UniProtKB/Swiss-Prot annotation:
Residues 48-81 are annotated as: Disordered. This is Uncharacterized protein DDB_G0290437. Residues 48-73 have a biased composition (Low complexity). It comes from the Eukaryota. It comes from Dictyostelium discoideum (Social amoeba).
Amino acid sequence: MNRGFVTGVRIATKCANKSSNCGFKAASSNNIYNSFKATCTLNNNNNNSNIPSSSSSSPSFASFFSSTSTSATLNGSSNNKTVVPKSLENISSASQFNFSTFFIISDV
């Protein structure tokens, strides 16, 4: 198992409010995680208790654990990971993603 840490990455949302799927791509200067991708499936539970809040004065951080996701997969190489983080599975609105800085921990 390899554990990698990426800080200060920027997440760009790729989905509209109430869409069925939401995709994220993390851009990092670290080549190993330059193509790190996280996807989540939206549902109607509106349970974002695991999603950190954001404010202009304090950046938000979230952790992605591929080891806790039943949908985690590794696509052949260390620079192309696709996971469904447990912390992002139960949101119902893309508008809840009002932050863009993440602390990513990935176990593969």
